[in-house]
Amino acid sequence: MPKLTHFDKKGRAKMVDVSKKGETLREAVVRGSIFMNPKTFKSILSGKIAKGDVLAVAKVAGIMAAKKTSEIIPMCHPLNLSHVEINFYPFEKESRIDIEAKVKIKAPTGVEMEGFVAVATAGLTIYDMCKAIDRGIVLSNIHLVKKTGGKSGTYTSKKFPSPGGRGITLLDKKL
């Protein structure tokens, strides 16, 4: 079992020293799902939510959150991210929207947590903008799909593979 690096010899929490680690290209893909009633789902996709364009706001919120991860998660290093991309995948039968964050950096530490914070924040933003019409919204299954780079190499989830396909972009919503 790998050693937990965020604890000292006495079991107290500490920030990992990454100063001697080399910079490598690191990427993380994190995904989560948000379930809602069919009316809310259709209202989001048709742009009929009173607070505005839900997915556009959720996208910006997710990107902003990724950049602020070290202010939320105590032992995360502050990072100058190279790229953050948020995509949404709608599934009408389940009244579900999958949220995916792709984060990239060349650094001595990974960006998985930035991906998790981006997905969670995008989902929470969707809830916030839609709670007036649907208090039963559920945000779930936030998980690491894939990570590359660093000493541990590549990890790809076998339990939650990415469904593929093309996500909704802001241009798609304007059609």
Q: Could you tell me what each predicted segment is?
A:
Residues 1-55, 60-77, 83-160, 170-175:
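C-terminal binding/interaction regions
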Residues 163-167:
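Intrinsically disordered, glycine-rich low-complexity segments
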